[in-house]
């Protein structure tokens, strides 16, 4: 069991590294003048065929087709919220803040998922856990310190818009994912995590073609480098990281400590985005109070991961909810 747990934690850490591509490559595309609409649309247009390649080994296509045909508008609506609107907000914000700041702010999604629970559930999951909320408060304080220090305590209009966009994305992502998961519970349709991600990616395609049409109208065709970087996000974050994380949680789903450690590896995204942004984009690493805020975010995520993992272990429904908030 120890070897399995160590392997799962290693896979989760590697998954966090690949998830970091979202922040770093989005920032690279924005810094190079790539239009945010192309960056967002290309990511999910390219994620679809990449996920299709691995689907035969992840439960197959047939269950997904049946689920989409049975309730097409449910999938369309929640995929538009949880994937399209989420990604538009996160990608647009990359033009106004370094990768580490976007990554750190997006960690608000862990408390967003808790705050949304009373709106989504009508059972014991609607309860707001006090200890988890306290740790979420640590994350919020850390994000506030990072934002305030980076912008020298004076957020201009663009900074406020960027902060609002990332915060909105942090709520839209768990809202869309958990709503689909709740729909599957009620309909009795059994899809694994990869099938759900593929289904939402497929269902969101009409929106992405509209976004691509808008991008083509206002910015022309994307540069080859932007297409390449968007493909990197699709491959790294949309495919590899997703599969690695699901594999890690599956290996230790009945081990509270190990599952918590796996979830806590999410905190490494902030560290990886700082290192990669500094090394490859020439960004300035957080210093002083900004660094202290980043440390608070990491502490909050690690603590929350350990707490949530302990409470979710052995509970199939809770573990599925935990896994549903990753993989975009």
Each language-model region and where it sits:
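C-terminal transmembrane-helix exit sites in multi-pass transporters
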Residues: 109-134, 252-253, 258-261, 268-291
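Hydrophobic/aromatic residues within transmembrane alpha-helices
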Residues: 29, 39, 43, 93-94, ...
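Transmembrane alpha-helices of multi-pass small-molecule transport proteins
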Residues: 32-85, 112-116, 168-179, 196-216, ...
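Glycine-/small-residue-enriched transmembrane alpha-helix faces in small-molecule transporters
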Residues: 1-42, 134-144, 152-185, 203-211, ...
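Cytoplasmic-side transmembrane-helix entry/capping segments in multi-pass membrane proteins
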Residues: 8-13, 68-78, 126-140, 190-199, ...
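Hydrophobic transmembrane alpha-helices of multi-pass small-molecule transport proteins
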Residues: 51, 118, 128-150, 287-308
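Helix-helix packing/entry segments at the starts of transmembrane helices
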Residues: 16, 42, 102-108, 184-203, ...
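Specific transmembrane alpha-helical segments of multi-pass solute transporters/efflux pumps
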Residues: 18-21, 59-106, 145, 236-253
């Amino acid at each position: 069991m120890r070897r399995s747990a160590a392997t799962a934690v290693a896979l989760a850490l590697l998954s966090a590294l690949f998830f970091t591509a979202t922040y770093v490559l989005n920032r690279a595309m924005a810094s190079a003048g790539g239009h945010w609409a192309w960056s967002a649309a290309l990511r999910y247009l390219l994620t679809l065929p990449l996920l299709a390649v691995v689907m035969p080994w992840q439960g197959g296509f047939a269950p997904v087709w049946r689920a989409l045909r049975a309730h097409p508008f449910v999938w369309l609506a929640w995929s538009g919220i949880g994937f399209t609107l989420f990604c538009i907000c996160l990608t647009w914000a990359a033009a106004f803040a370094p990768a580490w700041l976007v990554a750190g702010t997006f960690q608000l999604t862990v408390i967003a998922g808790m705050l949304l629970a009373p709106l989504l559930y009508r059972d014991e999951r609607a309860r707001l856990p006090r200890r988890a909320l306290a740790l979420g408060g640590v994350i919020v304080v850390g994000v506030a310190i990072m934002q305030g220090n980076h912008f020298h305590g004076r957020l201009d209009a663009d900074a406020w818009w960027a902060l609002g966009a990332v915060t909105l994305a942090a709520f839209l992502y768990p809202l869309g994912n958990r709503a689909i998961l709740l729909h599957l519970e009620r309909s009795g349709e059994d899809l694994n995590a990869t099938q759900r991600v593929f289904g939402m990616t497929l269902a969101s395609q009409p929106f992405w073609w509209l976004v691509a049409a808008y991008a083509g109208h206002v910015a022309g065709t994307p540069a080859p480098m932007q297409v390449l970087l968007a493909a990197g996000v699709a491959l790294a974050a949309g495919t590899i990281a997703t599969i690695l994380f699901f594999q890690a949680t599956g290996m230790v789903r009945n081990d509270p400590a190990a599952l918590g450690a796996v979830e806590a590896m999410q905190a490494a995204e902030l560290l990886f985005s700082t290192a990669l942004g500094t090394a490859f984009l020439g960004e300035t690493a957080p210093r002083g109070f900004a660094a202290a805020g980043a440390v608070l975010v990491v502490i909050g995520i690690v603590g929350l991961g350990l707490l949530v993992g302990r409470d979710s272990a052995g509970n199939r429904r809770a573990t599925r909810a935990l896994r549903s908030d990753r993989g975009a």
